Swiss-Prot record:
Pathway: Amino-acid biosynthesis; L-histidine biosynthesis; L-histidine from 5-phospho-alpha-D-ribose 1-diphosphate: step 1/9. Belongs to the class-II aminoacyl-tRNA synthetase family. HisZ subfamily. It comes from Bordetella avium (strain 197N). Heteromultimer composed of HisG and HisZ subunits. The keyword Cytoplasm applies. This is ATP phosphoribosyltransferase regulatory subunit. PANTHER family: HISTIDINE--TRNA LIGASE, MITOCHONDRIAL-RELATED, HISTIDYL-TRNA SYNTHETASE.
Length: 385
């Protein structure tokens, strides 16, 4: 095996792709700032108990672990930045007002999420803390849609769900709550037969709970799913509230293709309100994920209402058209003060000036040099090639 080979699921980012990723990073962080989001930068590595606080067990499987040489405690390389940002809000900033935070940094997965996914992601996201209402959820959704619009993603589709629907069924039926893990697995797999078999193996389950679980796997589609759910599911107060929250948010974003799936329980145990995933042609999986998660900060001693989203910038860039080569000005190498001053002045205006090193006058691959800095009538002048 060659020493230059990288581990499975990891890859170098070459100049054209790196340029596209960096352009997106700058544009998106600038966008988030216009909404009032403050940039934070948590560390790449933390103690494992802090890093996984308030998160589901799935994140533990994705977290690379190592031993701290100074303390002997177990460290984790972050696989997601959301918990870290929640820690900053709850423990370090300790504000009582609404706080908007954004972030961008590398995360590492111990294993890829699927056969086509990378183990190293450049995660960017935004979170609103301190407001439990619809308004914060809508602001996050609007920011998601503006994010993909700026990136050039065409015809996105937004899929909404709400874990409160399933939680209401569990709260109303202790027998269902006792086997919640098994039911969640069956709902994730849309296993209609498996759900039907519960009647024979779990006699304590209420009939209306079994009927509701069977209905959930069929309750997907457009916004009319809400009306069907009101007819087919029991009118439990918490369940009705979840449907109301889902419908209000869905109707607030009429200009995007929308889908609802009431059996989508991917964030169960972590999310506490409306959840969403954004899909688009050219990406095999969800491009953006997010939702409400009000209880994560409790692990840091201060539970705050929270809602937000994140995406992988490298994944986003990979599905976009390649970046155009940069336009540059070619200049000779030299120590003439007038030349040095002319080059510096051009660079200060934002121009790319590539000084050609001796013997490499015809070597230029990365940039398209459409202009040249030449000495004309005793002055350095830019001429079009």
């Amino acid at each position: 095996m060659g020493n230059w080979l990288l581990p499975e699921g990891l890859a170098d980012v070459l100049p054209a792709e790196a340029r596209r990723i960096e352009e997106l990073r700058r544009e998106l962080l600038d966008l988030y700032r216009t909404y009032g989001f403050e940039l934070v930068a948590p560390p790449l590595v933390e103690y494992i108990d802090s890093l996984l606080s308030g998160m589901g067990g799935d994140l533990n499987l994705y977290t690379c672990k190592l031993i701290d040489q100074l303390s002997g405690r177990t460290l984790g390389v972050r696989a997601d930045m959301t918990t870290q940002v929640s820690r900053i809000d709850a423990h370090l900033l300790n504000r009582n007002s609404v706080t908007r935070l954004c972030y961008c940094g590398t995360v590492l997965h111990a294993r890829p999420a699927d056969l086509l996914s990378s183990r190293e992601l450049l995660q960017i996201g935004a979170e609103i803390y301190g407001h439990v209402g619809f308004e914060a959820d809508l602001e996050i959704l609007q920011l998601v849609l503006e994010t993909v619009a700026i990136a050039g993603v065409s015809r996105p589709r937004l899929d909404l769900s709400h874990p409160g629907v399933v939680k209401a069924l569990f709260d109303a039926d202790p027998a269902a709550a006792a086997i919640s893990g098994r039911i969640i697995m069956l709902l994730r797999e849309k296993d209609v037969a498996g759900l039907a078999e519960l009647a024979g193996v779990e006699p304590a389950l209420r009939a209306d709970t079994l009927a509701a679980l069977g209905a959930l796997v069929r309750l997907y589609g457009e916004i009319d799913v809400i009306d069907r759910a009101r007819q087919e599911l029991p009118a439990l107060p918490a369940l009705v509230l979840a449907l109301d929250e889902l419908e209000r948010l869905a109707r607030a974003v009429p200009d995007v293709a929308l889908g609802l799936d009431l059996a989508d329980v991917g964030g169960y145990g972590y999310h506490s309100g409306v959840t969403f995933e954004l899909y688009a042609q050219g990406w095999h999986d969800a491009l953006v994920r997010g939702g409400r998660y009000d209880d994560v900060g409790r692990a840091f001693g201060r539970a705050r209402p929270a809602t937000g989203f994140s995406l992988d910038l490298r994944k986003l860039a990979a599905g976009l058209s390649p970046a155009e080569p940069g336009r540059a000005i070619r200049a000779p190498w030299g120590q003439d003060p007038a030349l040095v001053g002319a080059v510096r002045a051009l660079r200060h205006t934002g121009e790319i000036v590539v000084q050609v090193l001796p013997g490499h006058e015809h070597d230029q691959d990365e940039f398209v040099c459409d202009r040249e800095l030449v000495l004309q009538d005793g002055a350095w002048t830019v001429k079009t090639l």
